Amino acid sequence: MADRALNLDDFLSRFQLLRPQPSRHALNQRQAAVLVPIVRRPQPGLLLTQRSPLLRKHAGQVAFPGGAVDNTDATLIAAALREAQEEVAIPPEAVEVIGVLPPVDSVTGFQVTPVVGIIPPDLHYHASQDEVSAVFEMPLAEALRLGRYHPLDIHRRGNDHRVWLSWYQHYFVWGMTAGIIRELALQIGARP
């Protein structure tokens, strides 16, 4: 995949041909969802945020827009779209949802469902000052290059975990966010 440019049609056909495997039984019962926004361009981008340094949890970390499901959300997809609107002003109607990835258990006790959606290139992002300190775009082909992610094995709360680490410009991409991007790369058939 690194040998040639990845265009949006290639990404969409590969994503739709390779459906996520059914997920294992969830360790966590509290539900959350994140939007994995792919920017519609000839060479698509992946939209990411950097969380505010003032937040109690995951302060300053690179993340996808998203959060906990609340009682106004009819579905996990609705939760991801609501959170994306609250955090970076992406209107729900501007997102073309193309699917979901297998849920991921977070260290904070949530089962997080990544919702993959295509967004227009001309959206004007407006970061919520309470939650987001930066919004940036990474070329999708670069984000999906498996060789950019490095494993770190840790022992936490009595369990062994593997987390993935990477840099993009001055942003440190790691943990769940790097794991979701890596899962997306594997989903479309990227090879290490």
Swiss-Prot record:
Please report the stretch or stretches of sequence annotated as the Nudix hydrolase domain: 29-160
* Principal EC category: hydrolase
Needed cofactors: Mn(2+); Mg(2+)
Residues recorded as binding Mg(2+), renumbered to this chain, are E83, E87
Q: Matching CDD domains, A to Z?
A: NUDIX_CoAse_Nudt7
Extract the InterPro entries matched here: CoAse, NUDIX_hydrolase-like_dom_sf, NUDIX_hydrolase_dom, NUDIX_hydrolase_NudL_CS, Nudix_NudL
The GO molecular function terms of this record are: coenzyme A diphosphatase activity; magnesium ion binding; manganese ion binding
Q: Does the keyword Zinc apply?
A: no
Q: Which UniProt keywords are given for this protein, alphabetically ordered?
A: Hydrolase, Magnesium, Manganese, Metal-binding
List GO BP terms, alphabetically: nucleoside diphosphate metabolic process
Enzyme Commission code(s) on record = 3.6.1.-
Domain of life the protein comes from: Bacteria
Question: Where in this protein would one find the motif Nudix box, according to its record?
Answer: 67-89
What Pfam family does this protein match (any one)?
NUDIX
Give the family, as the similarity comment puts it: Belongs to the Nudix hydrolase family. PCD1 subfamily.
Query: What does this gene product do?
Result: Probably mediates the hydrolysis of some nucleoside diphosphate derivatives.
* Name under which the protein is recorded: Uncharacterized Nudix hydrolase NudL
- Species whose genome carries this gene: Klebsiella pneumoniae subsp. pneumoniae (strain ATCC 700721 / MGH 78578)
